[in-house]
């Protein structure tokens, strides 16, 4: 499992353990979860957001109305939590940059490695990195090369999400990007190709055992076109993004993917529709027990992954 990849992306200095309460802020609403009494049981809840309230991105504001987001957080978390406390907060991939970086060498001590990583990021991300929240984890090392996964979020954007959680009466203990959180829900060691749709972005990721081979987020087209035109161009971009990931999977692993693991709004049925056919098997990374207006399909992977370790 990939729980260690997502384990401490943006750690809280006050708490060395992942909170046993998690929530994800999506364009459809806030989903919250905690472990149940039985083994592997997950207790979950959902509070909807009206369209347009969340606009995840690298520039603030990400919310058109923070009070509405805070109210949805409070509703979802209060429904399953007996008392306020620390919570793992999962934010849209579009609000974070996740990169795989190679170095000839990298110091073992974080205090020495972080300035080197920060210097590299200056040329790779379209925002100021001096005060950005940065976390990294060693992926592989050997043969004169060190590969790390790096997650970086602008300080103002991170503060916006944390403020909404605090306004809801909870304390953000760990903040995770959506797909990295969801990857921890993968079971088994077989290579996996994950497609995560959240609002106006799509992320494709490839894993092999505890190694992340690809993480690519694409913001889908939203222009001043008619709704049908926007939908057409977004579907076309999603198809292209998935095709590129499938080709990378086959080139890297010398075999085509047997299936796509879907997470994000709409579940596998919606992903199949957008891809324009069932030429490859698509299944839920984490199936929704029942899909209703109260709990949309495909929305549980992030919180389940966040609770996996």
Give the residues covered by each predicted segment.
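Hydrophobic/aromatic-enriched cytosolic interaction surfaces used to assemble or bind macromolecules
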Residues: 1-309
């Amino acid at each position: 499992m990939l729980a260690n990849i997502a384990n401490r992306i943006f750690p809280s200095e006050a708490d060395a353990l992942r909170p046993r309460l998690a929530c994800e802020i999506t364009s459809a609403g806030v989903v919250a979860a905690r472990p149940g009494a039985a083994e592997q049981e997950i207790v979950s809840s959902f509070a909807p957001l009206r369209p347009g309230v969340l606009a995840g991105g690298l520039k603030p504001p990400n919310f058109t109305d923070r009070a509405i987001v805070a109210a949805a957080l409070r509703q979802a978390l209060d429904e399953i939590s007996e008392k306020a406390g620390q919570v793992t907060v999962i934010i849209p991939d579009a609000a974070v940059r996740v990169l795989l970086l190679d170095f000839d060498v990298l110091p073992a001590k974080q205090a020495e490695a972080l300035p080197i990583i920060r210097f590299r990021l200056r040329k790779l991300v379209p925002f100021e990195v001096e005060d950005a929240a940065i976390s990294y984890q060693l992926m592989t090392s050997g043969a004169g090369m060190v590969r790390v996964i790096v997650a970086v979020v602008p300080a103002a954007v991170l503060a916006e999400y944390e403020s909404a959680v605090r306004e809801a009466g909870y304390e953000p203990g760990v903040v995770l990007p959506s797909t990295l959180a969801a990857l921890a829900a993968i079971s088994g060691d077989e290579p996996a190709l994950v497609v995560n749709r959240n609002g106006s972005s799509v992320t494709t990721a490839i894993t092999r055992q505890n190694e992340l081979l690809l993480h690519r987020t694409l913001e889908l087209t939203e222009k001043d076109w008619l709704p049908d035109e926007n939908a057409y161009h977004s579907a076309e971009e999603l198809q292209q993004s998935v095709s590129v990931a499938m080709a990378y999977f086959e080139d890297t692993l010398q075999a085509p993917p047997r299936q796509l693991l879907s997470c994000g709004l709409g579940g596998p049925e919606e992903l199949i529709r957008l891809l324009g056919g069932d030429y490859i098997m698509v299944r839920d990374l984490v199936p929704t027990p029942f899909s209703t207006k109260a709990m949309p399909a495909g929305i549980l992977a992030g919180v389940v992954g966040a609770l996996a370790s």
